[in-house]
């Protein structure tokens, strides 16, 4: 019995020591996750501020600055757009001066992609610029690449579009 008690005592002590050793790394990882969340949520704000004002001179090009040249945009209702240029042409035609995009508060989640960047996902809603009424909502996912100190969206998915129920 004493050997079993001694074994479990050593095992528990080793587990406690390894948990203490892991704690500083966990703090560093949490700080890194917080920094990534702050960075990507800031990118979302900047990207869509330019999107929402794309009828103002220079804002569509500012919006373009966040997008990879070979951007792929997947929209459940509109299909796939294979380049930044095609996406910008569609945005100018269908979005600018018509509606704005709003992030649904509390819906944003950000996940790191090792040696690449991050995934951003959440819910957004769309609101008419003339009436200020929000008419639809959808889920979204953006794949961000971080290369040479610059972040750019390489893939954007907007899906599950549905009307917002009137109250």
Residue ranges and their predicted role:
Residues 110-118, 132, 144-151:
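A short, structured loop/turn motif at beta-sheet edges
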Residues 69-72, 121-127, 160:
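Generic short beta-strand segments
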Residues 18-69, 164-167:
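Short, low-complexity N-terminal intrinsically disordered segments enriched in polar/charged residues
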Residues 38-39, 57-116, 134:
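A solvent-exposed, acidic/Ser-Thr-rich amphipathic alpha-helical stretch
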Residues 137-166:
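Short beta-strand edge/turn micro-motifs at domain boundaries
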Residues 114-124, 138:
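A short hydrophobic beta-strand element
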Residues 5-15:
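Bacterial N-terminal signal peptides
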């Amino acid at each position: 019995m004493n050997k079993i008690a001694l074994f479990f005592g050593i095992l528990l002590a080793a587990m406690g020591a390894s948990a203490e050793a892991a704690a500083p790394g966990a703090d560093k990882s949490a700080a890194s996750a917080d920094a990534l969340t702050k960075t990507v949520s800031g990118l979302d704000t900047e990207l869509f501020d330019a999107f929402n004002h794309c009828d103002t001179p220079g804002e569509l090009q500012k919006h373009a600055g966040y997008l990879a040249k070979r951007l792929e945009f997947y929209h459940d209702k509109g299909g796939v757009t294979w380049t930044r240029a095609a996406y910008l042409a569609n945005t100018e035609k269908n979005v600018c001066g018509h509606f704005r995009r709003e992030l649904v508060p509390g819906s944003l989640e950000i996940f790191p992609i090792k040696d690449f960047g991050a995934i951003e996902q959440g819910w957004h809603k769309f609101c008419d610029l003339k009436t200020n009424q929000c008419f639809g909502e959808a889920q979204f996912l953006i794949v961000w690449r971080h290369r040479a100190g610059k972040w750019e969206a390489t893939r954007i998915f907007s899906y599950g579009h549905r009307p917002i129920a009137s109250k």
